[in-house]
Amino acid sequence: MSLFKILVAAATVATALAAPHEHKKPHPSYGDANAQCGNHQKLSCCNRGDSGGVLDGLLGGNCQPINILALLPIQNQCTNQVACCTGNSNGLINIPCTNVNL
């Protein structure tokens, strides 16, 4: 009976040690952020507006494309909100930029 307990304990420890751990990068690169953008979207830096709301800075008027090397940390190039923008502002209801979660 004690051999069974030892085997169960060893299997439990081995399973816990083999569990994958997620390691987040402290400073995501341009390439990491750009990977969240879809087709025909450009990674952009959006200035914060005065409204303070959910759509603050994401309506496209204050966004500038980021053209930078893929290896550099994105915080070095954009200290405001990073977003994926289509550059298209045609239509009745249109939000040309979406937030990038870093």
UniProtKB/Swiss-Prot annotation:
The gene is hyd1. Disruption phenotype: Leads to disordered conidial rodlet bundles and sharply reduced conidial hydrophobicity. Shows also reduced, adhesion to insect cuticle, insect pathogenicity via normal cuticle infection, UVB resistance and heat tolerance. Belongs to the fungal hydrophobin family. Its main location: secreted. Disulfide bonds join 37-84, 45-78, 46-63, 85-97. Pfam families: Hydrophobin. Residues 1-18 form the signal peptide. GO terms for cellular component: extracellular region; fungal-type cell wall. This is Class I hydrophobin 1.
